[in-house]
């Protein structure tokens, strides 16, 4: 499928173009150019024709995609395969898939969860946490749906190498999965939002989650990643003007953007807010606490 994280057609093109450059002075360079061009075009056509697949040998944590049903009155979202794993480490966990019904009139909070990638000040994984009461929060995260033995590559993600999934998890699952890794930082930013906006956003995102189960789509490192997918739903449901800015391009800056726009639900200044909403250590400390969602926000 790809070599060292780079799609085969790119590697093949390089392998052909380099010898051609060295043989430019030879009379028979033209056949090489023609052959290389044909091979490149064939590989490109095969890539364009490649379709995402629903059935593969998926890793356990994304084996069961969400099945979503909206009630006739539009007020209850029932979801099968909500993930509620108990994570001790990335490889040590108790698997649990449950069915949950979410009553939209109980929706009372929205948080943006940001996990900076390593020490990066620019790149991060972004998720949304919807609250239906103090300890009933559900996280929706657009992610790569990995096969067994597969690892993520930013370059490979540009060339139809991964399927996209909207993972729906309990907040404890989503945050402890990432918090099990010592040193991993997490930020939970409360967002100022009307219930009407939160409702339409939740319906939009869960609807897309269910649609991907039946109509799979490729993940794309630039156009269909964790942050661009969230932004598309926010823009679609927000009653106002919103532009594709640095918070989408560089999601590790999204906290700063939220604060500048007045969308962060706090009276603290930016530095104080970042310290207040830094939650990685609390996630690890209270992973098994019955009031997990409350404790990690204190």
Give the residues covered by each predicted segment.
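Activation targets extended, charge/polar-rich intrinsically disordered C-terminal tails
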Residues: 1-20, 206-298
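Juxtamembrane helix-break-helix junctions at the cytosolic face
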Residues: 18-29
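Internal/C-terminal transmembrane anchor helices
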Residues: 27-52
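Alpha-helical transmembrane signal-anchor/signal-peptide segments
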Residues: 51-73
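A short, structured loop/turn motif at beta-sheet edges
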Residues: 70-75, 131-135, 195-198
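Juxtamembrane extramembrane loops of integral membrane proteins
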Residues: 75, 80-82
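Glycine-rich catalytic cores of cysteine/serine-nucleophile enzymes that process amide/ester linkages
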Residues: 77, 88-186
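Soluble catalytic domains of enzymes that build or remodel membrane lipids, polysaccharides, and related
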Residues: 159-236, 243, 247
